């Protein structure tokens, strides 16, 4: 017999799989993402200017960047080299540092100043601040300035009254109140008088160092990954000087009075260059260009140094009261836009993959970055993909101190957890406007609760498989499981397609919501024979995805959100499951047996103690114990703070229900009393008190003329007679009840 050969094999047909596309601001459309170097991605992100507390506007960008970074790295598998800068040399920092220093000195002296001298200085402060208010044209800022002016005037009035009373203690209190309320106007006044005298660089270093630390703490609190490389402007001045010199050598920058400016028109005329790639319609927007130059760099003498109003500063000559570094053009400091160009290029070279920033930085900052970098390298492209996060509004309004809706990150974290904030961002597109409001956060909170209940149920229902013999961990597979598995697979396909489509986390979470819903239906309909392995696979997939999104921190391998330990630090849920749960289950089993016996014996005091253990004692320990109609009970380890909030909400709901019941009872009693009082009215007198309607009545008490003296119509008299007849019936019933009594 001849040897048989293998039959022909039919290769499966290739299926088109979705490719990762990102919305590129350089083209204003979604583009296939193709890194310059295979699987390696170079990424530069604009960091903060550190002179004040980080707010939700910062969170909008940095949480979104973190989500994008994690997904590209942990889901798509790219090797990302992530660089972020810290702007610690800037006009805002210089002015704020100078003013803080001068105010602190003044406040210490002002406590000892004679009152007439202090009040005399106050008039100078007031005059300068009133001039500032008059010049301002920004409506929101004007509201804020007017409120500051009002508070300052009120504080001065209070101080003047205290002086009149001669009460030294009250004078001291009102003096301090004035200094606090007028801090900004006083600081500005002092800066105008003494700002040029500040020449200690330590003054300009302390402020950004402090706020940089606060920024990093905020990022850690939000579970945002630190950058691989952090660049500070103050540590890059020599490289920035070299970078500027390259632009000068290429004929696209010029020195003027110890400053250096970028030649926008000269750049735009060159064939390979194009100014304002991101926002071409903003070319010539001098207002935005001046804002980008900085508060200390828009005086007439500075503006007159430019060849064109479109030109912008690469190097600023420092005046008295400003920090400086040596350069070939004189003592000065870097311009804002050149900082990012020089630092990113120092790390990555002449081109890199991704540049990210807030949408408000498109023009002029990012457009100027592109221009000066392309000028330095004499290339037509510096960045391949420019990604911009959308604006953030507060309850539909622009975030503004004047509107009293300015929310710092720490203030936001007092109301909602980092997980809830991240879920709110995940439920919105990263490139669109996000409205931070009660409605937005309620959606995020409910989504978190929805997922958490699913995780807790799965862990409770499938916990036994971890302790049983290996063979018992595999349950029978039926059509029901096959249907759920198909929906599970479809959800994975939908999630992948969503993430490929410009990292659409909102659609991905919608697919997860649907998967959890069908899984909950499976649990409801198959309580007696659940396939534990399938349920755990679904829950583990969702948990891993939330890890990728940064919504869950800590080690992987468990199911659900981590449970907070007694110290408040997040412990690994799997560790608590292993170490704590056996003891809690023993307690729950003992309580169950006691409770069943108490039911039999009708021992209500013992039942009350069992309820107290469930409702008050265990929640304080992070344990939710649920009594079941079918089966014994369910034990779930939950974050203690979440449980306490649940309990408070439940108690509040019960209190509201009781209050509503009492309100209805009171309303019913009042209605009954009113009805009883109405029965006692003689029908002939029922209209006599309505003098605001009628002016004359007949012998039976029926109105004959209205308040203006006109006769009441026949139709109206018929209606009144009917009402009187009804009252007569009620009145007779009342008289009968008295006689009977």
From Swiss-Prot:
The keyword Transmembrane does not apply. Residues 704-713 have a biased composition (Basic and acidic residues). Gene3D superfamilies: HUPs. It is found in: Cytoplasm. Its EC number is 6.1.1.16. Zn(2+) binds at residues 46, 340, 365, 369. It comes from the Eukaryota. A motif ('KMSKS' region) lies at residues 398-402. It holds the Pfam family tRNA-synt_1e. Its cofactor is Zn(2+). GO terms for molecular function: ATP binding; cysteine-tRNA ligase activity; metal ion binding; tRNA binding. Binds 1 zinc ion per subunit. It catalyses: tRNA(Cys) + L-cysteine + ATP = L-cysteinyl-tRNA(Cys) + AMP + diphosphate. SUPFAM superfamilies: Anticodon-binding domain of a subclass of class I aminoacyl-tRNA synthetases, Nucleotidylyl transferase. Belongs to the class-I aminoacyl-tRNA synthetase family. This is Cysteine--tRNA ligase, cytoplasmic. The lineage of its organism: Eukaryota, Metazoa, Ecdysozoa, Arthropoda, Hexapoda.
